[in-house]
Amino acid sequence: MVAHNPKRLTWTLAACALIACSSGESAKAGAGDRDSSGSGGGDRTLVVFNAGSLALPLRAALDSFAAREGVTVQQENAGSLETARKLTELGKIPDLVAVADYEVIPLLLIPEHATWYAKFAHNRMVLAYGDRSRGAAEINTGNWWQVVTRPGVQVGRADPSLDPNGYRTLLVWQLAERFYKQPGLAQRMLASAPARNVRPKEADLVGMLQAGEFDYIWSYESIAQGTGLKYVTLPEEIDLSSASDSAAYAVASTRIAGKTPRDSVTMRGQPIVYAFTVPTRAPHAALAAKFAAYLASGDGRRVLRGAKLDVLERYLVVGSGAPPSL
């Protein structure tokens, strides 16, 4: 199926502005590079590092939490791998880390920087496009792979070394090749999305698609919905959304950098699951625990859902040392 633009244009424009400012530094609720919400002194500042695809949902949750608690909040958006490496390589320690692939936390942060994580949301890979995109009038769930591999079609994708969306894109291509029984399809998709079309994170691609620089971008359904983009849904066998297809997803794999530049690890296809943690050296651990509890509360989940995130009914905590409220 093909999803169309939502009616709430004002909300969509605000969402696009926030996505556009997701530069890997701090984000405002609408524009700019740094944000503070709520009131209170510096000792009541909650700092959150999160995946670019969580920019909108966590912005909404942070604003709600700040209003309730009378605290200041700061948000930094980047690819999940880049987010984790802010701790491991730059020594920047936030109060809470939220990533688009739960595996990033045990892979890069445990045990040195964290001891637990909470799985809290799902997503699915989609192919987003605009009215001016080549093939926009005819693309659908059945023919998308033929449209994006046509000569001249330009496809944007995220950097697999910085963002899970980037390596998930490569996995989707492999799964599509098997699903459609088209040998060489993954390589043809790569030709339509060469290195010059790679950006640090999937959120960076939205503005370029809207400006007509790309015909299509690989994204998440939550981002496409949150920014009002049209998109093509993919079969569950390849969109990394279905728990029942876990074994089939796992046949696809790619390698990315590990804890050090010299290390590499294999990432296999699996259902998309988001997670968050409070670092062991979080400057405001008690406040972070309170925010984590808010994210898991009924009110917190409603706010996240309102920002188009598919949150779990019950969060799954892995590891030890998590706040009792989770």
Predicted features by range, described:
Residues 10-20:
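Bacterial N-terminal signal peptides
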